[in-house]
Amino acid sequence: LKTTATPDGDGFRINGSKIFTTHGQFADVFLAYVRYGPGVGGIGSVLIERGQDGFKTGNPVKFMSGEEWVQLYFDDAYVGPENVLLGEGGFKKQIAGFNVERIGNTARSLALGRYAFEIARDYAATREQFGRTLNEFQGLQWKFAEMKVKLDAAELLLYRAACNSDGGFPSAEETSIAKLYCNTAGFEVANEAMQIMGGAGFSEDCLIEYCVRRTRGWMIAGGSLEMMKNRIAESVFERRFSQRPPRPETK
């Protein structure tokens, strides 16, 4: 994080940029994380209003899921004290809310996988091949059984993370496990549903193709699956691991 907040009177001057602001072309107010100083303790956040001096947004760029994002640019943009959301050291408090966001991410990914499953199930019950419906073929029956197990197991992990909240926030460990499994299951089930339906599932006339694209995005958004694995490993070994390269020794 390189966007800086430099003191200027009662407020701050913001310089830097922020990428991947989803639907930012429609927003009037933006939340941006900034660096007041070094390290995690130096991170906070401010509110920036569209149209103010020193602030602009880039042209929209489309994600594979169909959503669009813009980049934010700060060139000595002034933020008054009333627009400082979190001062220096505040990021440690706000980061607890990420687990809540990840629960929502997880639920949406799972819902898309289940929706794709239901579309493919109904298709297999009515589509005929070689004189009988697709669900009469044992190979496809096994596919649906495996998809059902993945969805139900993912749902239980999601409920565990949501219900076992401590002080209003899900635990980082259970949230990471749920996100890792549900994101993976949601995509795999949607992808398998498309395979079962063949060309019909690959068509934009069928919502399964959207489910595949969107569930793939959830495997990145809100913390990549690799980040979730890192967090789970820390719980396994009951210690923190730094993924950063060692700093060179100073003389």
Kindly give the residue locations of the regions a language model identified.
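Conserved hydrophobic/aromatic beta-strand scaffold that supports enzyme active sites
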Residues: 2-4, 11, 29-33, 45-47, ...
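Internal mixed beta-strand/loop scaffold within catalytic domains of large alpha/beta enzymes
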Residues: 3-17, 21
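Short polar/acidic secondary-structure junctions
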Residues: 6, 36-39, 62-64
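Alpha-helical interface subdomain recognition
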Residues: 7-12, 73, 96-251
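A short core secondary-structure module
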Residues: 15-56
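Flexible, small-/acidic-enriched active-site or ligand-binding loops
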Residues: 51-78
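A short, charged helix-loop
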Residues: 70-96
